[in-house]
Amino acid sequence: STLFPYTTLFRSDIGCISEAHHYAKEVATGHLPFLLTSCCPSWSVMAKKYFPAMIDNISQELTPMVATARIVKKEHPHAKVVFIGPCASKKLEAMRHSVRSDVDFVITFEELWGLFDAKSITPSTCEELPEETQAATAAGRGYAIAGGVAGAIENCLKEYYPDVPVHIEHAESLAECKKVLTLAKAGKIKNCMIEGMACPGGCIGGAGTNAGFAKTSKALKKYVDGSEPKLPSQELENLELN
């Protein structure tokens, strides 16, 4: 069998440029009072469960995991797709009827480390696979930290829609997310993009991580700061991944 490594970062780039377009088209024109991000499955599930009237305000953009999986299945129809990351909630997302044919398995970093340990595999001694050819921008690479999605969308709006006023809110932890949604429901937060992340600190603070937040956030910042270009091309909003 052949292993094809893919990252979800390029799909994050597509997502942030599409979200910026959606914000400019729907929120800035008053068609929607606010727009909720959808890349964190726990956040979107909570919003749908406790605030069902807001379902139409949740972005319809595919999550980076699903978008990547669909590209893999298109390029390699018989491939088995395994998503590896710090998020335990991705396991439930992969079980959805609309997703289960795209993502075959989900394992966390912690589980992967356990597999390495059980099989006496030392990653540093293994042959490196070639990186995916489509590199991500700093915007896509910053998705994993709280405020990263909102920040990427905000920067895209300022670059490509300079005449559109930008109002961004973000919350981390489900308790804070619920507070923000309660305020939005009451009309106290409006005309904005709202990013929600279930895990404090964002994805890098996920339940399945195998490293401390201080270490991972520092590494991510270095990774983002060293990335070029900083923003995805506006042309990406025309890509169809559905």
What are these language model-derived features?
Residues S1, P5-N242:
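Iron-sulfur-associated redox domains of electron-transfer enzymes in respiratory
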